[in-house]
Amino acid sequence: MRLSQFWLVTKKESPAEAEVISHQLMLRAGMIRQTAVGIYSWLPLGLRVLNKVSAIIREEMDRAGALEVVMPAAQPAELWQESGRWHAYGPELQRFIDRHQRDYCIGPTHEEVVTDLVRRDLSSYKQLPVNLYQIQTKFRDEIRPRFGVMRGREFVMKDGYSFDLDVAGMKNSYQKMYDAYCRIFDRLGLNYRPVIADNGAIGGTGSHEFHVLAETGEDSIAFSNASDYAANIEKAEALPPTKPRPAPSLEMEKRATPDCKTIAQLVERYQLPIEKTLKTLLVEGADGGIVALVLRGDHELNTIKAEQLPEVAKPFSLAEESKVRGLMGAGFGSLGPVGLKALSVPVIVDHSAAICADFVVGANEDGYHYFNVNWERDAEITRTADIRNVVEGDPSPDGQGTLLIRRGIEVGHVFQLGEKYSKAMNLTVPLEDGTLCTPLMGCYGIGVTRVIAAAIEQNHDENGIIWSKELAPFSVAILPINADKSEAVRDAAEALYQKFLQAGVDVVLDDRNRRAGVMFADIDLIGIPARIVISDKTLATGSVEFKRRNEQETFHISLEEIVAQFCAEEKH
């Protein structure tokens, strides 16, 4: 490709609206342009990268036995009503009415459509298993689109769906996709972690998320420093402490704490170790009453875990303040477990809080706290449970090492759906003995556009993007210095360009006749992995100047040997 014939529209300054580095660099490099809030056009440079990612995905899907299809973006409401998601999905689902007054949506995902597609032609168990996938533009009306294509409203996604006759088959299909996703992200050169995850709105029985580690990630993930264990912080188990609870050493006393409505204020005012404070949260109970959840002041409630408790109402919600005040006689900042047994309020205590002694809690009276409280003597535990988020340094749930907590960008998610959609949509197939079987499904997604942003978040410097060779829009750039003034430079650059083309290399020639500084800045900004500089000075020694984007050192290599040497290195 000749840059004089390419739509390269770079910018020196970062646009004010770009919050994260990937958004800044994608705009500056001329990869994307915003069309509307959360909606972007992909320019030629960006599309080349998008196509590189899609090609790797297709290769690994084909290798794993998945079959590519294309399903419609517009989906009839009837299918979503069959699954029960038409009303459950919420305002993120973009709905519209056609000229015949029929309801449709723009698909954010395709479980319903693919289930309908398969049930139309599935007549024998011999047709299964089957795994269908597509790479398609989706739309989700995010309430707060941000970070460019990382959380846009319109995005490109690879979504796949498997159908199997039994649990063993479903798990086998799931493992194939899990392995394929690992190969994809390995090939893309990403520093990522597959983590145990919650199924969320998709439903099903088991799932893993694939997270690219980056400080700008919106999710927290926990992983062992000594094993492959990794989990979304929502799913990571906090193991019960092994040490016993200390014996009480002080008598409980009630103190006025008029200026202490938060744990932080209490700790600062009385110079307390924060782990000596307990917080009590009152939540809606499954029976219509109230349930108390108690955890250490330095720990955060995990609402996903709390919602799984049989005593707690689904969906999880804090009790209304008026209800709390009517029962307890105090507001949220002054609650504690003392006296709750007499009010028939179940007290579920996190394992870490259950081994505390001589701790501080709210006194169920505004402006007062109890100090030196102890379990059994002063307050009763209904039962203990894991209801908190893990923290860095906690023991790994697999017994190997301790946990690290890092931010992650979710770029992939695989689910074992089971019968969730096939049963709801009456998908059945006759078995050999004539009995009807409801196939078990899996679904598998990769955010293709998000992968690109995540790769930039991990691979950049002050000069721009640093692409891996698998993702780069071009493999090597030829930069002829003062080509408009030197016929020798111009001819040598053209000859070298043709040799690279003949060798099948994705090469770009900067023939725009710009100043050397402009050429260097643009090539660094757009992240080309290697650059070759040709000048009268290098030609005088029969060489070119060669530099890798991710290295500081430059090398002088023979003009006659550079193509062969470059191609040999690219194979390794």
Curated annotation (Swiss-Prot):
Q: What are its E.C. numbers?
A: 6.1.1.15
Q: Which CDD domains does the entry link to?
A: ProRS-INS, ProRS_anticodon_short, ProRS_core_prok
Question: Where, subcellularly, is it found?
Answer: Cytoplasm
Where primarily located?
cytoplasm
Any Pfam family the entry gives: tRNA_edit
What catalytic reaction does the record list?
Answer: tRNA(Pro) + L-proline + ATP = L-prolyl-tRNA(Pro) + AMP + diphosphate
Per UniProt, the keywords (alphabetical) are:
Aminoacyl-tRNA synthetase, ATP-binding, Cytoplasm, Ligase, Nucleotide-binding, Protein biosynthesis
**Quick check: keyword Transport in the entry?**
no
Q: Which family does it belong to?
A: Belongs to the class-II aminoacyl-tRNA synthetase family. ProS type 1 subfamily.
Domain comment from the record reads as follows: Consists of three domains: the N-terminal catalytic domain, the editing domain and the C-terminal anticodon-binding domain.
What is the protein name for this chain? Proline--tRNA ligase
Instruction: Name its species.
Output: Dichelobacter nodosus (strain VCS1703A)
